[in-house]
A protein has these predicted regions:
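A structural signal for short, well-ordered beta-strand segments and their strand-loop junctions
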Residues: 13-14, 59, 116-118, 138-140
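Inter-helix linker motif
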Residues: 135-151
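RNase H-like nuclease fold core
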Residues: 26-118, 123-128
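Short, amphipathic alpha-helical "recognition" segments used to contact nucleic acids or chromatin
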Residues: 1-8
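Short, surface-exposed amphipathic charged segments that create phosphate/polyanion-binding patches used
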Residues: 150-162
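Acidic/histidine-rich catalytic cores and adjacent linkers
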Residues: 67-68, 79-84, 100-101, 109-134, ...
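Residue-level marker of motif borders
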Residues: 56, 137-139, 293
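Short, basic interhelical loop/turn and adjoining N-cap
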Residues: 9-29
Length: 329
């Protein structure tokens, strides 16, 4: 049935068949779907498990299903059509102990099959995976690692912007007190200082070779005004380049070289990043064994969010989970 295979609203599917949406939903939910006889209904609000979908390579991530409540999703890296049979577990909550208790409901033999689990840097995920999949190694997703470094650079930019706004507000007040009209300093590209810092956000995410002419001009002015931000930008590019390596040993060497530069730069935000990365370093370096990422989990989460958005929110959580099972498990 289309409802079982399409992550769409009942109203959209009903309009396709030219029937009333409420009639279709009532008929599907109570007559043909099997929802009333669902074998996981008694514990659906707490967890759902699908041991038959376990493979050697898994991903674990969290997603908000309803009213901001977070659920933990364990999925395989099934590349089949529309992520069919990709869900291994759906767990209400993100607490390590709760995740572990649910995963341990899957028989030990199946859990020992798992060789690799990719994830973000969340400590709770790491603890749950370590205790539940004892034969597996954990791989921290490169996207989350690089984003942490880039966030540190952007934090510097935002702090500088707020400082520029504060200085401008003081200057405006002084001009007003002196019964003068405040005229902001306009830079050579037409930006004021606060505008320069606001409009530089996206160029800092890009490599120099990808800048437009206007972005290159803006970057030149930005780095002339704020040389420490230029240093942070260069350090960010160097860190991203580490992931071009195919050797774990070479990647570690480059990380240590990068760390030395961070210490020398004495940039507070980057010192904090180094401490975080060192805590997770072994799992970060595991990426270079098979270059595994959490991209499939992020893609799957996007599909769930899109499905939820189509429904304009989730009113019946159990029925929503039931439909997720039909679609993806």
């Amino acid at each position: 049935m289309q409802v079982d295979t399409r992550p769409d609203t009942m109203s959209n599917i009903a309009s396709y068949y030219n029937v009333k949406s409420k009639t279709l939903q009532r008929h599907y939910k109570h007559k043909v779907s099997g929802f009333k006889e669902w074998n996981q209904a008694s514990h659906a609000e707490d967890y759902l498990i699908y041991p038959e979908n376990i493979t050697e390579n898994l991903s674990i991530d969290e997603v908000s299903l309803s009213k901001g409540e977070l659920y933990t999703f364990v999925t395989n890296k099934n590349k089949g059509v529309k992520n069919k049979k990709c869900v291994v577990a759906i767990i209400n909550g993100t607490e390590a102990k709760v995740i572990q208790q649910v995963l341990e409901k899957i028989e030990s033999e199946k859990r020992l099959v798992v060789k690799e689990v990719s994830m973000d840097m969340a400590r709770n995920m790491g603890l749950a995976v370590k205790n539940s999949f004892q034969n597996s190694k954990m791989v921290i997703d490169r996207f989350h690692v690089v984003r942490l470094v880039m966030d540190a650079m952007q934090h510097m930019r935002v702090s500088l912007r707020w400082a520029a706004i504060k200085e401008e507000n003081i200057a405006i007040k002084q001009a007003k007190d002196n019964k003068q009209k405040y005229i902001a300093l306009v830079l050579s590209n037409g930006d004021t200082l606060r505008e320069l810092l606001a409009r530089s956000r996206y160029l800092l995410y890009k490599s120099e070779s990808d800048w437009t002419v206007n972005q290159a001009k803006r970057a030149s002015i930005l780095f002339e005004k704020y040389p420490l931000l230029k240093t942070a930008y260069k350090l960010t590019l160097e860190f991203r380049a580490i992931y071009k390596n195919i050797s774990k040993i070479k990647a570690l060497e480059q990380f240590n070289e990068w760390k030395t530069k961070i210490i020398a730069s004495n940039i507070e935000e980057f010192n904090t990043v180094v401490n975080s990365l060192e805590y997770h370093l072994d799992n970060i370096l595991n990426f270079f064994d098979n270059r595994s990422t959490n991209a499939n989990a992020e893609s799957f989460n996007s599909k769930i969010k899109g499905f939820r958005a189509n429904l304009r929110g989730v009113t019946d959580v159990n029925f929503f989970l039931f439909r997720l099972e039909k679609l993806f498990a």
